[in-house]
Amino acid sequence: MPEPTFHELAQLPPPVLRQLIRRGDYTGHTSGLGQRHLQANLVILQKSWADEFLRFCALNPRACPLLDVSEPGSPHFARLGADIDVRSDLPRYRVHRRGQEPVEVSDIGTFWEADFVAFAIGCSFSFEQALLDAGIGLRHLELGRNVTMYRSSIATRPSGRLAGPTVVSMRPLKAAEAIRAIQVTSRFPMTHGAPLHLGDPALIGIRDLARPDYGDPVPLAADEIPLFWACGVTPQAVLAEVQPELYISHAPGHMLVSDRLYDEL
């Protein structure tokens, strides 16, 4: 049986897509998948870090809009889907150990610990369908690429040991489209809301748009403006500063596709 095309994957209901991912049959990015369903960034921490991180999310709701939190030791997000198992239902994960480079894997069952707490954080992939419905084209989708992401100079609000830069995702748009995109995305605070910045990237510490820190580069036309949204990769940048002994995250662009519709929250 031939592998499904990306267009065919985009038509799959979330439970079917997750089954495909769970079997290891798809390990690519999830931008453009799930259609109108919420996608979530993932952070998994040992319980000793959980309260601190929960407060960090509360202090930084633009970057870390919290969709759900698991019980200690549970790999399930009951609010997001009845059969979700965070150990296997994302296409790619990063396992971070203090003093070591992250390891990318497609299943974290062998790394799971009894005191792990999982956090689902809203993702801007969720509002991309609303932008498309408004007639706003998205370059990374047109090119079949992951979204472009950068570490910015915008500081997060600290919580105990947790402090660091805000990561932003970028989408290039023409001026009229940019105005409409701000109007559309401001309706979705649980998926990062309106952009944090538009225009000159140097004002938020980004030196070269062609060299993203995460994701894939996309070209910017002469008549386009770069728009920057807060991004759920922010926790990875912050946790890299303090280096817990062990934590797990999604690989940037490889999200959990939930059963919830993006406009339900």
From Swiss-Prot:
<dbReference type="Pfam" id="PF07286">
    <property type="entry name" value="D-Glu_cyclase"/>
</dbReference>
<keyword id="KW-0456">Lyase</keyword>
<dbReference type="InterPro" id="IPR009906">
    <property type="entry name" value="D-Glu_cyclase"/>
</dbReference>
<protein>
    <recommendedName>
        <fullName>Putative hydro-lyase PA2116</fullName>
        <ecNumber>4.2.1.-</ecNumber>
    </recommendedName>
</protein>
<dbReference type="InterPro" id="IPR016938">
    <property type="entry name" value="UPF0317"/>
</dbReference>
<dbReference type="InterPro" id="IPR038021">
    <property type="entry name" value="Putative_hydro-lyase"/>
</dbReference>
<dbReference type="GO" id="GO:0016829">
    <property type="term" value="F:lyase activity"/>
</dbReference>
<comment type="similarity">
    <text>Belongs to the D-glutamate cyclase family.</text>
</comment>
